[in-house]
Amino acid sequence: MARDVDNKQNAKRISRDEDEDEFAGESMVGRTLDNPFLGEDEFEDIFGSESQYISSSGQNSTNPFLADTRIENSPLGSESKANQLNKQGTNVNHIEIPLRDFNDPTQPESFLPPPKNTFTSRIKKIKNLFKKEKKQVKPEDLGPRQIILNDYSANHFLHNAVSTCKYSAFTFLPKFLKEQFSKYANLFFLFTAVVQQIPGITPVNRYTTIGPMLIVLSVSGIKEIMEDIKRKKQDQELNESPCYVLQGTGFVEKQWKDVVVGDIVKIVSETFFPADLVLLSSSEPEGLCYIETANLDGETNLKIKQALPETAGLLKPVELGQLSGEVKSEQPNNNLYTFDATLKLLPSDRELPLSPDQLLLRGAQLRNTPWVYGIVVFTGHESKLMKNTTETPIKRTSVEKQVNSQILFLLCIFVFLCFASSLGALIHRSVYGSALSYVKYTSNRAGMFFKGLLTFWILYSNLVPISLFVTFELVRYIQAQLISSDLDMYNEETDTPAACRTSSLVEELGQVGYIFSDKTGTLTRNQMEFRQCTIAGVAYADVIPEDRQFTSEDLDSDMYIYDFDTLKENLKHSENASLIHQFLLVLSICHTVIPEYDESTNSIKYQASSPDEGALVKGAASIGYKFLARKPHLVTVSIFGKDESYELLHICEFNSTRKRMSIVFRCPDGKIRLYVKGADTVIMERLASDNPYLQTTIHHLEDYATVGLRTLCIAMREVPEDEYQRWSTVFETAASSLVDRAQKLMDAAEEIEKDLILLGATAIEDRLQDGVPDTISTLQTAGIKIWVLTGDRQETAINIGMSCKLIDEDMGLVIVNEETKEATAESVMAKLSSIYRNEATTGNVESMALVIDGVSLTYALDFSLERRFFELASLCRAVICCRVSPLQKALIVKMVKRNTGEVLLAIGDGANDVPMIQAAHVGVGISGMEGLQAVRSSDFSISQFCYLKKLLLVHGSWCYQRLSKLILYSFYKNIALYMTQFWYAFCNAFSGQVIFESWSISLYNVLFTVLPPVVIGIFDQFVSAGQLFQYPQLYQLGQRSEFFNLKRFWSWITNGFYHSLLLFLCSIAVFYYDGPNKDGLASGHWVWGTTLYAAILATVLGKAALISNHWTQYTVIATLGSFLLWIVFMPIYAVAAPAIGFSKEYYGIIPHLYGNLKFWASLLVLPTIALMRDFVWKYSSRMYYPEEYHYVQEIQKYNVTDYRPRIVGFHKAIRKIRQMQRMRKQRGYAFSQGEEDQSRILDAYDTTHTRGAYGEMR
């Protein structure tokens, strides 16, 4: 019953179609349905009746969610398929929606809600009139796919090679050019380069713009190609993975890319499926096999698949090679957990139905099964996993977007200057035209104005620094290499370095406000270990904390913990020895684990679909209760070397509603006993009135919960024979019922699960990745909000949240776990009201953590509730979303993206994390044990979560600060030089005359000032890495955009204007009374212009030195070296250029320049005057208005000892006291047993039989 309810609720999931252009900031966004099986009643449950939708004219309009949504239009095409989906059990109940966001071209537009009647929507409608509609072909319209067995020539389908590359040989140029010319600056330079080719317009050489622009585009293109080559290599590594394919009567090794539809492949344990397969047979009884789908849905427990009975006996390659027949399947689609197909084996005409029970998805891993045979049905990009991936998105950083917007404002100033200069030329002509008859002005004033406009456009075009973009890309690439070569983020154990796959996002790492993290494989190792237990009120552990070790001074205290050796002694001599025996017996026989003898190691290997059960069985075996063998109705266990067999009578299965599993055994002494394990809440409700160890056990459970251990309560009762016989009849009747069987079985279990005796509880550790608690704590201190999105259950998620310190003892838990939309809305609103009431009463908001499950999240993401849900989530320091599907992970990220302007980072290690990683501004992949799908789709990859701390706090902060300074400095230095052209226009009758020689203007950016921004962008450190770790609060400078914002940008622009005007006026003053030189000639225009050029160069290089925080030899080379380069270059160029006819402006200038005292005095005095204001400003701001990092710079400079370690002990003591006072209701229950048909597993295996010649279990 609960399972059916869960499926129905999850069938109502909806998704968003994000349109950032039209709907950004609006509360209503487009939606489409992720599940094709919704009827009209279900639509009304979610969206209300049709009458709620009113057209703009005031008339009732058709509900857009009901149009064209008949079952026959669904991807599967029949109502029976919806029913079949609900029969699959809860292994699909929370992941039935596909991974991809629903910008699905196959869905009718009528799914979308009515758009607002805005100007934007009208424009879009007009554009749509001129668009040529493409007819979209739906998969169901193509008919079934026909696959012929063992006839490769008859099957012509897509190859199995996959690619995650951004470009191909054909798409590189159009895609790259589209991306580059989406930047306003590049469009501006393109237009300028075109105008510059018009004869008689340009005042400078016609190639001074197009040349640098081609260099910029070339460098950017080379960088993109190199990064895409890396992606191609990773794709190649996957495509060349080995697998075994049937050829004739034997299997040969082939590469994944060579697998084709119709192949029969052999997959061995611990390997991934290379394509979507139909299971034919396996080494296990009745064609069973275990698969791990953590790479797909994040679930830690194993799933069970079963071959058809007609094919389960095909164990020999010869038999497989003789197969003839066909598979008719649905066309490739993105529905992961539905599959409709039939198998016909000749000579029979019977068509055998295939379902998801026989479907093995690409990306899943075979576990605890030696081998399986399967038929390939979908390959490559037609596999269901790849159908759910989207094209690698093109991401742009916040800084880049700000630069783009500020360039627009700068262009407005530029256009104003052009118009002002052109207008000035007309005014000057009107006033002085008659006195300047030799100029020969044209009579066409309008033509003169527009010609002047284009001339000044070219003359002032360098106000926007073209070199910025090539420098920007170059520095980004080098920063990416520094990240990839950081040995602190190198995992020696797995030989895995960090990798930057998208260098264009490095500065985004310094502004992250939210982190969305997967749990399994990212925060945890998914390795369960039996750590502690409490039996009859006594606590035991494998490792005992120092403050809890037993002393003889207080024998009766329940504060102490004993080791497992003491547990073994108490089995022999304690008065509670019988309870200890029964406790360990439950661990060793009450489970679905399959034992298998390993001849190579002469030991037993346990195959467990639940990692929790595996840990408990191994824990019991380590104490002396070793599980040996299983038959369909018999379990054998060795107790300290003595074998005992227990007859399994009935099993009451575990599910998420019952939260417990119970098995009825007939024990060797002839008595019937019921053994139960489950959550503390459900076990304690069913205890007998006399349980002396209840309170002590509760106290121990709370202790386990505070350290993040996963707990289960263990209980039992003896069942009288007559009671058992009566109950057995009730249970068998319920098991054979055709109507509401699940509820009747649960009711039957309730009748016998009563008057239990509490034996104790277990505590299992889900091992965290190294350094996870410290990393999370540090990142939270840095002001980053962390959301954990996991497919696991609520209890498991809370448990991990505690152990990894995402949830600490100071936090209150806000839990939203509802079944309907109305209940979810009420819960969210009630919790918001409570928080605001508390704030009004106490004056502050308590530190809280929000926990929400997948069903509630479906409704919380609805547009009517989204804002309120985000408001609640934003008030919480941490958020845990459990039982979420891959698509929901992406929708959560997009929801936060719509409601906040902060940078979002998503981190995960499985294919189920790919939508989330692609939806976030920054995607980080963990190169772990769940494959490399997440890594291939990510922007950065690391091998452990703990490396995220340095990636963000150090590399992120440095990259953001460095690139911000690089951008600001690049704009400043261009304005400082090129604005002098505008000031000079007032002195030359707005004629368009230039101050500087043409190629000197171009070389200013390309040669003489290129090194300072590069060196600053690569080597500058506003504080050291150690200080960034010690003071993670400094990371908030990036979150607040302190280093690059509107105020700071325009202060630099203003400073550039100031320096250009000051130096221009001072240079005029220096040469105003210029007398003749030794040769009797005046210095002239080019001497004055070159002196001004050198003074500006010295000033901007001095400015670079002034803003450098971290001096290296490269800083000296970039500043002093660049100026010395100009001093050496100038005489060589002035002699060589006129001699070869390249440029004649500098002919004969060197004697007048280098022999002129005014020139050398100007190089010393003018930059000093210009930079004096900057020096005074820097001194006063640091002394009287210091920022946070200024204090840290002083601490770093003078090596001041940090005072904070002195109070660490005090804080630890306070936390320990709070731990003792809190979490009295949360007792750490968590259990990852899959809700499979557990009886089927127990009935299928007889492990006393040996395996056959092909490894099959007979």
From Swiss-Prot:
UniProt cofactor(s): Mg(2+)
A family per Pfam: Cation_ATPase
Ranges facing Lumenal side: 205-208, 428-451, 996-998, 1073-1086, 1137-1148
Ranges in coiled-coil conformation: none
Organism encoding this protein: Schizosaccharomyces pombe (strain 972 / ATCC 24843) (Fission yeast)
Residues binding ATP: 518-520, 613, 654, 656, 659, 677, 710-711, 790-792, 883, 889, 912-913
Annotated binding of a 1,2-diacyl-sn-glycero-3-phospho-(1D-myo-inositol 4-phosphate), by residue: K1103, R1173, W1177, K1178, Y1189, H1190
Catalytic reaction annotation: ATP + H2O + phospholipidSide 1 = ADP + phosphate + phospholipidSide 2; a 1,2-diacyl-sn-glycero-3-phospho-L-serine(out) + ATP + H2O = a 1,2-diacyl-sn-glycero-3-phospho-L-serine(in) + ADP + phosphate + H(+); a 1,2-diacyl-sn-glycero-3-phosphoethanolamine(out) + ATP + H2O = a 1,2-diacyl-sn-glycero-3-phosphoethanolamine(in) + ADP + phosphate + H(+)
GO terms for cellular component: endoplasmic reticulum; endoplasmic reticulum membrane; plasma membrane; trans-Golgi network
Molecular function, one GO term: ATP binding
Subcellular location(s) of the protein: Endoplasmic reticulum membrane; Golgi apparatus, trans-Golgi network membrane
Biological process according to GO: endocytic recycling; phospholipid translocation; post-Golgi vesicle-mediated transport
Residues spanning the membrane: 184-204, 209-229, 407-427, 452-472, 975-995, 999-1019, 1052-1072, 1087-1107, 1116-1136, 1149-1169
Cytoplasmic topological intervals: 1-183, 230-406, 473-974, 1020-1051, 1108-1115, 1170-1258
Record keywords, A-Z: ATP-binding, Endoplasmic reticulum, Golgi apparatus, Lipid-binding, Magnesium, Membrane, Metal-binding, Nucleotide-binding, Phosphoprotein, Translocase, Transmembrane, Transmembrane helix
Gene3D superfamilies: Calcium-transporting ATPase, cytoplasmic domain N, Calcium-transporting ATPase, cytoplasmic transduction domain A, HAD superfamily/HAD-like
Domain of life: Eukaryota
Entry keyword Translocase: yes
Annotated protein name in UniProt: Phospholipid-transporting ATPase C887.12
